[in-house]
Curated annotation (Swiss-Prot):
Principal cellular location given in the protein's record: cytoplasm
Organism expressing this protein natively: Oryza sativa subsp. japonica
Name recorded for this polypeptide: Casein kinase 1
Compositional bias segments (type: Basic and acidic residues): 315-328
Family matches, as InterPro entries: CK1_Ser-Thr_kinase, Kinase-like_dom_sf, Prot_kinase_dom, Protein_kinase_ATP_BS, Ser/Thr_kinase_AS
Keywords, in A-Z order: ATP-binding, Cytoplasm, Growth regulation, Kinase, Nucleotide-binding, Nucleus, Serine/threonine-protein kinase, Stress response, Transferase
Posttranslational mods: Autophosphorylated.
Lineage start: Eukaryota, Viridiplantae, Streptophyta, Embryophyta, Tracheophyta
Residues involved in ATP binding: 15-23, 38
Gene responsible for this protein: CKI1
E.C. number: 2.7.11.1
Induction annotation: Induced by 24-epi-brassinolide (24-eBL) and down-regulated by abscisic acid (ABA).
The keyword Transferase is assigned to this record: yes
GO aspect biological process, one term: signal transduction
Length: 463
């Protein structure tokens, strides 16, 4: 018996599950377009699909925001139908032997900052910035980064009055500890600065292969978070970014200099990385590391030398939790590409398991319109091997509250509140030096820089 959602979407095979419910492949019976269908029981103790669907509706129209196609109740389930997307950056990171080149990181950084900025302009914080929550598109959108998983997103200001949420302390850690900002560890209410600091950790994770606070052992989750927090605060950004371009140091210094209600200068941050991209002599061709890996895999397969690249069946199964060595993660993730209970878990030998599935998705070279307003619908040249990678996070019911967090650092209202840099100096005695000198060159004066804002090939014009 065929199940049709909303009279329009045929429910296909199950491709994932998580704490939020179940994820299915679907197809629009009118257009044959493949979609992703999320199901959540109406009896769920902590329903979030309705909230997430509202966020999708509020964010519709932004580049890199999946298109919400339908939401409603079918029988005993809340159902959300959205775009079918490709692999996450965590999957691609594993596929590329857990290291990204500087070129790939800079191309990703530009798009990722744009995605965070867009959410902020719509009045929301993401609050769970991590590689799993950034996905690549499929087909004509294969070079476009999408941001997903709005389960922890929070409205930080009123769009009409622009009134900002109040400063608070003693907040539980919300998000993923590995990428959480220093202020989040200290129990401070999150604001725009924290999303950007988290993004900085993601970028360094891609460049370095790991972060200094990974793999710390502790008896309890609270002790684990405390160890991560301590290590993070005791690691100067100069050490974190050692042997990498100083622009990454400047990025962190800037993010940590922001006060609670400050509006970040997103253009400055993008310009840091764009100028570095040009100075390194890179071409904005959207050939990522995995694009080259995919081309090499295809070449080897054609010559019959594929033994080292072929992984197991593409069908998703849950990896046993026995080797889950990263308890700093507490968001449920659906991942049909990787056999794991939590992606980004540091299983360094597992990257080859992703190759055969990812190879089928990665085109040798694809350029798309990344910065034009995305249309209300997108076409796909459907392949039955395509999969969805959609995740859903919710705060843990057991999030630890540090009893020593109250009045960690006395603050006053308004602009006199300390920045993260000042907090670090007060808390650890670390010396920090400012490197916030802004480049004088205007992005609009350089034709190469302008290509970051509009690509020469529009996906919507391609047939």
């Amino acid at each position: 018996m065929e199940h049709v959602i909303g009279g329009k979407f045929k429910l296909g095979r199950k491709i994932g599950s998580g704490s939020f419910g179940e994820l299915y492949l679907g197809v629009n019976i009118q257009s044959s377009e493949e979609v992703a269908i999320k199901l959540e029981s109406v009896k769920s103790r902590h329903p979030q699909l309705h909230y997430e669907s509202k966020l999708y509706m509020l964010l519709q129209g932004g580049t890199g925001i999946p298109h919400l196609k339908w939401f409603g109740v079918e029988g005993e389930y809340n159902v959300m139908v959205i775009d079918l997307l490709g692999p996450s950056l965590e999957d691609l990171f594993n596929y590329c032997n857990r290291k990204f080149s500087l070129k790939t990181v800079l191309m990703l950084a530009d798009q990722m900052i744009n995605r965070v900025e867009y959410m902020h302009t719509r009045g929301f914080l993401h609050r769970d910035i991590k590689p799993d929550n950034f996905l690549m598109g499929l087909g004509r959108k294969a070079s476009q980064v999408y941001v997903i998983d709005y389960g922890l997103a929070k409205k930080y200001r009123d769009l009409q009055t622009h009134k900002h949420i109040p400063y608070r302390e003693n907040k539980n850690l919300t998000g993923t500890a590995r990428y959480a900002s220093v202020n989040t560890h200290l129990g401070v209410e999150q604001s725009r600065r924290d999303d950007l600091e988290s993004l900085g950790y993601v970028l360094m994770y891609f460049l370095r292969g790991s972060l200094p606070w990974q793999g710390l052992k502790a008896g309890t989750k609270k002790q684990k978070y405390d160890k991560i927090s301590e290590k993070k605060m005791l690691t100067p950004v100069e050490v974190l970014c050692k042997s990498y371009p100083t622009e990454f140091i400047s990025y962190f210094h800037y993010c940590r200099s922001l006060r609670f209600e400050d509006k970040p200068d997103y253009s400055y941050l993008k310009r840091l990385f764009r100028d570095l991209f040009i100075r390194e002599g890179y071409q904005l061709d959207y050939i990522f590391d995995w694009t080259k890996q995919g081309s090499e895999s295809n070449r080897l397969r054609s010559s019959g030398r594929t033994s080292g690249l072929v992984g197991p069946s593409a069908e998703r199964t849950e990896r046993a939790a026995a080797r889950q060595d990263v308890p700093d993660r507490f968001s449920g993730t659906v991942d049909p590409f990787a056999r794991r209970t939590g992606s980004g878990s540091g299983h360094y030998g597992e990257h080859t398991k992703h190759r055969n599935i990812l190879d089928s998705l990665l085109a040798p070279k694809t350029a798309v319109d990344l910065d034009k307003r995305r249309p209300t619908s997108s076409s796909r040249n459907g392949s039955t091997s395509r999969k969805a990678l959609l995740s859903s996070s919710r705060p843990s019911s057991g999030d630890p509250i540090d009893p020593n967090r109250s009045n960690l650092i006395p603050t006053s209202s308004g602009s006199s509140r300390p920045s993260t840099m000042q907090r670090l100096h007060q808390s650890t005695g670390l010396e920090t030096r400012s490197s916030l000198t802004k480049t004088a060159r205007n992005v609009h004066d350089d034709p190469t820089l302008r290509t970051f804002e509009r690509l020469s090939i529009s996906a919507d014009r391609r047939k």
